[in-house]
Amino acid sequence: MSFDQILLPGILRRRYQRFFADVALETGESIVAHCPNTGSMRGLAEPGLGVYVSRANNPRRKLAYTLELVDAHTSLVGVHTGRANILTKEAIAAGRISQLLGYGEIRQEVRYSKNSRIDLLLEDPSTQQCCYVEVKSVTLRQGDGAACFPDAVTTRGAKHLDDLAATVCSPRQRAVMFYLVQREDCRYFTPADDIDPRYGAKLRSAIEQGVEILAYACQVSSQGIQVTQSLPIHL
């Protein structure tokens, strides 16, 4: 995925009320940017970090700027969680996810339980096989290069695991939790048990019930983000 415009560099002054970020652009202008990330952004919200923002051309938007990338020194990090589904769909369609080859159709935001929609539904009409893919954007790096999720307690994330596990009811029906690590400096993926032990327990239970776990790293630059390679899973 290439950004459709040139990103503007700046310095993060503060992130507050979850969805707002004060940024000093390199031009000297101070702006308020939308922060499209509901997590804690642990390690990525400290004042003084370098950032990149995009500017919308829509005059009706209350905030013209959106926080896109944070410079974590060892890697640029994509913090726009809304881009995770786009990146994953693009990678699947391009055949870069070896474990998800062979599906002719990809649909987004398909209802699959009473109160949930799946991020991506892969289908092969010729064999009637399908694969439910829930995508999580991972930005937290800990310890010796572990990509960790979640970065804050998430009851919603635990519910998604329960919903996924409930779909594994036929050999023709797969369920995949896909962790998209939007940074380049991680060696493996592991659940963040120190932050949300309940989520880690739910993840291990879902695996026992047939849910598959995939984690992929990204190459991140101010020009765009590309899904690159599979990461080992440490449970």
From Swiss-Prot:
Signal peptide limits: none
GO molecular-function term, one example from the UniProt record: DNA binding
One Pfam family named in its UniProt record: SfsA_N
Gene3D superfamilies associated with the record: 2.40.50.580, 3.40.1350.60
Source domain of life: Bacteria
Recorded family membership: Belongs to the SfsA family.
This protein's name: Sugar fermentation stimulation protein homolog
Species, as recorded: Nitrosococcus oceani (strain ATCC 19707 / BCRC 17464 / JCM 30415 / NCIMB 11848 / C-107)
